[in-house]
């Protein structure tokens, strides 16, 4: 641990704030008659942040800033780099979609960068208030993005649902934080940990605080039964916004769980571990069983997300066995690996869906994917790779991610829970393979061909190659996650 008296550790966050202000000013100064420069400047910003956090991660150092409100450790650097890279890919995938719908404007890119800022603050927070600030920055930006097409009744309705339910979840989280503060007298995660570990705290207040905090966090992660917002928001939002919500925020939510439950409330593991067991089973059940009956593509992927968050929770709950955290690094790194690879696969999936859309046409139903292999065999193959990864079929990275989490669950002595997860995964494979069947064995609807620029084609190809190569050679990324988690647990 290295307390810092300079702003060097948080320089990337400051750079992002300056970049957002600069892009806003430049875009306003150019006026509406000229082409927006927000897109190339946003790409440049995300590239710089990816490289910056990546180089910081290579040092393996941990720094604290702003009176311990912020911690820049290897986990923060690695996850922030992936979030920035994920936004870069998202911006590339969504460019054509936005241009065809008159959404190719500066406000979209500034709000997207604000969501990235919220994710980074969530990942680097070392204080309940800092974490809440990052969460609200992400949430408020997301509300605005969902409502960006003001002329659409569907998106306006989705934004209102998102806002109301998000405010309710924030209230739950704040109430839980207030109870923790009342019991421990501090909002700093390290001080809360030591106060709870001392055993001199009112256990009733702590237990109620944990319940409200886990409920609030589960809403943000998208775990059942706090999942009500996900299907409606995924379906009602413009597909470009759906991708923004479905990707990086899930990685940041994982970091939020680690910061709060592991770094702050680990002595209460016996309380929150059983809560996560219940939440994970419900998420796997509702996500997989409900996705089967969906005909809307984005709604199906929404329920798919819920089931995947169940797997993330499985990794998180496996770190503590009989109140001992001996295998914590392995378990938490498996959940981190799962979150990162889920981001990678989600990007590829929605990238293909965005490619299938056109001006005046939204690829929203499963029927829209019929015969894709005849329109463009390469893009159909990439979609097949993404579906195999989401289903956990080798040799894709999704298979190894599920295997790593299941191994952690078994090592934690909960073999029965691993069996339940496998059974629901087998059920879930049906709706992923149904998409493959539609692409390869059904006749196409319409005559249009799938066309993409060289840049978009290259990005999708790299995305697909990464899903396969990381499935064949997962050791490097798994070791990166393990070292980051081990450093965080030891700091």
UniProtKB/Swiss-Prot annotation:
Write out the GO MF terms.
Answer: NADH dehydrogenase (ubiquinone) activity; NADH:ubiquinone reductase (non-electrogenic) activity; quinone binding
**Alphabetical list of InterPro entries matching this protein:** NADH-Q_OxRdtase_suN/2, ND/Mrp_TM
User: Which spans are transmembrane here?
Assistant: 6-26, 37-57, 69-89, 103-123, 128-148, 163-183, 206-226, 238-258, 273-293, 301-321, 335-355, 379-399, 413-433, 458-478
Localisation per UniProt entry:
Cell inner membrane
Which Pfam families does its entry note? Answer: Proton_antipo_M
Organism domain of life: Bacteria
Membrane topology (UniProt): Multi-pass membrane protein
State any GO BP term from the record.
ATP synthesis coupled electron transport
**Swiss-Prot/TrEMBL catalytic activity:** a quinone + NADH + 5 H(+)(in) = a quinol + NAD(+) + 4 H(+)(out)
EC number(s) from the headed UniProt entry: 7.1.1.-
What's an example GO cellular component term for this entry?
plasma membrane
Q: Which UniProt keywords are present, listed alphabetically?
A: Cell inner membrane, Cell membrane, Membrane, NAD, Quinone, Translocase, Transmembrane, Transmembrane helix, Transport, Ubiquinone
| Role, per record | NDH-1 shuttles electrons from NADH, via FMN and iron-sulfur (Fe-S) centers, to quinones in the respiratory chain. The immediate electron acceptor for the enzyme in this species is believed to be ubiquinone. Couples the redox reaction to proton translocation (for every two electrons transferred, four hydrogen ions are translocated across the cytoplasmic membrane), and thus conserves the redox energy in a proton gradient.
Question: What binding partners and quaternary form does the record give?
Answer: NDH-1 is composed of 14 different subunits. Subunits NuoA, H, J, K, L, M, N constitute the membrane sector of the complex.
The family note in this entry says:
Belongs to the complex I subunit 2 family.
Q: What is this protein called?
A: NADH-quinone oxidoreductase subunit N
């Amino acid at each position: 641990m290295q307390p810092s008296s300079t702003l060097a550790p948080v320089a990337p966050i400051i750079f992002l704030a300056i970049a957002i202000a600069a892009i806003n000013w430049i875009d306003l100064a150019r006026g509406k008659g000229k082409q927006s420069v927000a897109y190339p400047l946003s790409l440049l910003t995300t590239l710089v942040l990816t490289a910056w956090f990546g180089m910081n991660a290579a040092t393996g150092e941990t720094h604290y800033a702003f009176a311990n409100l912020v911690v820049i450790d290897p986990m923060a650097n690695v996850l922030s780099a992936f979030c920035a890279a994920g936004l870069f890919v998202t911006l590339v995938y969504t460019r054509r979609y936005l241009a065809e719908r008159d959404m190719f404007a500066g406000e979209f890119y500034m709000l997207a960068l604000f969501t990235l800022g919220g994710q980074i603050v969530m990942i680097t927070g070392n204080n309940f208030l800092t974490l809440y600030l990052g969460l609200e920055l992400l949430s408020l930006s997301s509300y605005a993005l969902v409502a960006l097409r003001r002329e659409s009744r569907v998106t306006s309705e989705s934004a209102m649902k998102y806002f109301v339910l998000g405010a309710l979840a924030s209230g739950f989280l704040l109430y839980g934080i207030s109870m923790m503060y009342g019991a421990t007298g501090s909002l700093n995660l390290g001080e809360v940990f030591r106060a709870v570990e001392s055993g001199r705290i009112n256990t009733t207040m702590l237990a109620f605080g944990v319940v409200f905090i886990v409920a609030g966090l589960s809403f943000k992660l998208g775990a059942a039964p706090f999942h009500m917002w996900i299907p409606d928001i995924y379906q009602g939002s413009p597909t470009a916004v759906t991708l923004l919500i479905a990707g990086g925020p899930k990685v940041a939510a994982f970091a939020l769980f680690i910061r709060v439950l592991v770094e702050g409330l680990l002595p209460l593991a016996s309380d929150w571990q059983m809560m996560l067991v219940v939440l994970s089973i419900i998420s796997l059940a509702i996500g997989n069983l409900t996705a089967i009956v969906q005909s809307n593509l984005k709604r199906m992927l929404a329920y798919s997300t819920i089931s995947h968050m169940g797997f993330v929770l499985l990794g998180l709950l496996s770190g503590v066995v009989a109140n001992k955290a001996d295998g914590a690094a392995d378990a938490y790194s498996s959940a981190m690996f799962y979150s990162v690879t889920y981001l990678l696969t989600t990007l590829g999936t929605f990238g293909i869906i965005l490619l299938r859309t056109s001006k005046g046409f939204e690829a929203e139903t499963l029927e829209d994917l019929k015969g894709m292999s005849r329109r463009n065999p390469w893009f159909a193959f990439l979609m097949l790779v993404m579906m195999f990864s989401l289903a956990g079929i080798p040799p894709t990275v999704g298979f190894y991610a599920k295997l790593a989490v299941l191994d952690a669950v078994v090592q934690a002595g909960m073999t029965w829970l691993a069996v339940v997860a496998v059974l629901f995964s087998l059920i879930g494979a049906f709706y992923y393979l149904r998409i493959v069947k539609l692409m390869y064995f059904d006749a196409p609807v319409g005559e249009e061909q799938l066309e993409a620029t060289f840049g978009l084609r290259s990005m999708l190809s790299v995305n697909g190659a990464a899903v396969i190569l990381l499935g064949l050679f997962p050791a490097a990324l798994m070791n990166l996650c393990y070292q980051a988690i081990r450093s965080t647990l030891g700091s």
